[in-house]
Amino acid sequence: MPVGFSQGLSFDRKRANWSRTGHRPLAWCAWYPANDDAVEIAPAPSWFKQTPVAPNAPMKKSTDPRSLVLLSHGSGGLAIGLEWLGHRLAQAGFVALGIDHHGHTGSEPYRAEGFLCLWERAADLTALLDANDWREVLGGAIENHAYVAGFSAGAYTAMLLVGACVAYSQFEPDNPQKSPIRGPREFPDLADQIPSLLQDEIFLESWNRRRDSFRDDRLKAALAIAPGRSVLGFSKESLEEITAPVQVVGGDADVIAPAQECCTWLHENVRSSSLEIMGGGVGHYTFLPEPTPQGLKAAPAVFTDVAGLVRENVHNHVAQMAIAFFSTAR
């Protein structure tokens, strides 16, 4: 089945961007089943491999509305970085809709606010689900409810949408669960930015929302891929109240977000969850795309796996898990 690909820009008119110069941007991209005669072309060369798609092709008609999966990237990442999952979901009949989270994405300059206020990412997906412009672009019938899959910080986002609530932000000084780092690789001094940012009105508004509920009952199930240490700041009471199905998956060799510390903890506190820790040397970045030679040269730490591990096989396994999970969660 050919896979169509479209992208666009929506706005959340209820929230300002971090500079308060306009509405918060919601840059999105989507993979979906296209008509059988759609012509697929190879995307422009980049740091990672991408499967050919049919740009802006008409969506293949179906008897019933198509199921929707929202995708949430990791810290400093891109929606297109989950192409490996989105494309496979589309081949299975789903519509996969990803977003670049403002201030926390590689598609624009990094903002400390975006890296600290992770709860705004959940509001991004709720706002995108509220919007109609991407539906008009894609055409076809798409369900109003959705599923959500996220990697790393995206897993945190997914959990917020099914009912997790923040007790402590990972880097706030009062957090009793002290982080072993001061920030992620993209923003290593992140914790040190908090005192000055608290003088900024728009940051303070968001910071004061951190313990709000971002649950969206339209989200029927969540796939949490390699959740990071930020999930340890969720309130256990909120996790115990989650009823939506949750699938947690991690890697046995993840040193960024150790599976026994993060995946297992999350699973033990969410009664409706299942857990799989993949063996064979699966690391945190194994869940990122396969590299091109250009990407491997530019970012070997991100694109190099242990000897004998085939990243494509890991992606195939997780995608099949996602397809089966979301198909039975309907």
What do these predicted ranges mean?
Residues G150-G154, A158:
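Gly/Ala-rich beta-loop-alpha elbow adjacent to hydrolase catalytic centers
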Residues S235-E237, A244, P258-S272:
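Short alpha-helix in the alpha/beta-hydrolase fold that links the catalytic acid
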Residues M1-L70, Q91:
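Domain-level recognition of soluble alpha/beta enzyme cores
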Residues R66, H73-L78:
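Active-site glycine-rich loops that stabilize anionic/oxyanionic intermediates
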Residues I242, V248-G250:
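Short beta-strand/loop motif that positions the catalytic acidic residue
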